[in-house]
UniProtKB/Swiss-Prot annotation:
PROSITE patterns: LCN_CSAB (PS51863)
GO BP annotation list: defense response to bacterium
Cellular component per GO, a single term: extracellular region
Entry text on domains: Has the structural arrangement of an alpha-helix connected to antiparallel beta-sheets by disulfide bonds (CS-alpha/beta).
Subcellular location: Secreted
Classification via SUPFAM superfamilies: Scorpion toxin-like
Domain LCN-type CS-alpha/beta: 1-61
Disulfide linkage: 11-61, 15-37, 23-42, 27-44
Species assigned in the record: Tityus discrepans (Venezuelan scorpion)
UniProt KW keywords: Antibiotic, Antimicrobial, Disulfide bond, Ion channel impairing toxin, Neurotoxin, Secreted, Toxin, Voltage-gated sodium channel impairing toxin
Protein name: Bactridin-1
Classification of source organism: Eukaryota, Metazoa, Ecdysozoa, Arthropoda, Chelicerata
Length: 61
């Protein structure tokens, strides 16, 4: 699945322009195929179904 990865509180991983390699690393550490900085947060491709991603219906941050 594709989406914004979240940290333990349910907030998106924040990023800034130019941090594509950092986001890609974070995404691949979560077993995704790749990722990039879709400012203001990291967007990942190919994540396993068990990885939690941002849900706009559950705004905690």
């Amino acid at each position: 699945k594709d989406g914004y990865i979240i940290e333990h509180r349910g907030c998106k991983y924040s990023c800034f322009f130019g941090t594509n390699s950092w986001c890609n690393t974070e995404c691949t550490l979560k077993k995704g195929s790749s990722g990039y900085c879709a400012w203001p947060a990291c967007w990942c491709y190919g994540l396993p179904d068990n990885v939690k991603i941002f849900d706009s219906n559950n705004l905690k941050c």
